[in-house]
């Protein structure tokens, strides 16, 4: 889902939820908590795949345009991580405009308490803050990937001003019934070799 132009704001946001503390990235000690949240969301049909500890380590080892110390916000209750949000961005080559990618993940039983809304507000505000440094902040956009099965998050995003711009579908084809049609004359199938990579990509 995508929202319109990113607008800078000097209005500070106050994050307050009874029993919840908000903090920034503490290091690799945060990874198990993130995995637990993502696993709970996967089990509830709110995540596309089950992420492992190694997945999270690899993700953080290859971050681009993201400083975990300032671009992640974590929520804790009774010393346990219950949610987090992040902001990363990419710059389009032709226009130099930035697209900010926002994520918000909370335990499903924390959604009705408003935690995800608070984290989304922070992510949007933080994207605007970073956008003020871009070449054309008035053209920057925010992007958020979610699943249609997560109707709570879809409704929250729409309430915040996001609207769908594209859909992805996972489809399966029965390989036993594929037609055995001959290739057109002059066309042949060849294996891909390393020397072909540049031309293909």
Give the residues covered by each predicted segment.
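Acyl-donor-binding surface of acyltransferase catalytic domains
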Residues: 1-14, 89-187, 193
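A short beta-loop-alpha structural element at the N-terminal edge
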Residues: 21-34, 188-201
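Conserved donor-binding loop and adjoining core beta-sheet/short helix segment
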Residues: 23-28, 39-133, 143
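Short, solvent-exposed polar/charged micro-motifs at secondary-structure junctions
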Residues: 32-34, 57-59, 152-154, 199
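Residues within well-ordered alpha-helical secondary structure of globular protein domains
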Residues: 37-40, 159
């Amino acid at each position: 889902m995508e929202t319109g132009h990113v607008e800078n704001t000097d209005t500070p946001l106050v994050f307050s939820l009874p029993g919840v503390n908000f903090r920034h990235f503490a290091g690799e000690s945060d990874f198990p908590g993130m995995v637990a949240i993502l696993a709970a969301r996967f089990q509830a049909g709110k995540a596309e795949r089950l992420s492992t500890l190694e997945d999270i380590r690899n993700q953080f080892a290859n971050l681009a345009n993201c400083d975990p110390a300032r671009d992640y916000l974590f929520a804790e209750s009774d010393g346990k991580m219950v949610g987090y949000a992040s902001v990363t961005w990419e710059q389009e080559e032709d226009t130099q405009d930035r697209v900010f990618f926002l994520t918000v993940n909370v335990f499903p039983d924390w959604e009705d308490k408003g935690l995800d809304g608070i984290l989304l507000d922070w992510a949007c505000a933080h994207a605007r803050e970073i956008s003020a440094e871009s070449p054309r902040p008035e053209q920057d956009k925010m992007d958020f990937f979610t699943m249609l099965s997560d109707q709570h998050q879809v409704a929250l995003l729409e309430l915040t001003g996001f609207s769908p711009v594209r859909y992805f579908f996972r489809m399966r084809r029965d390989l036993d019934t594929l037609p055995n049609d001959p290739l057109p004359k002059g066309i042949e199938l060849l294996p891909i070799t390393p020397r072909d990579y540049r031309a293909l990509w």
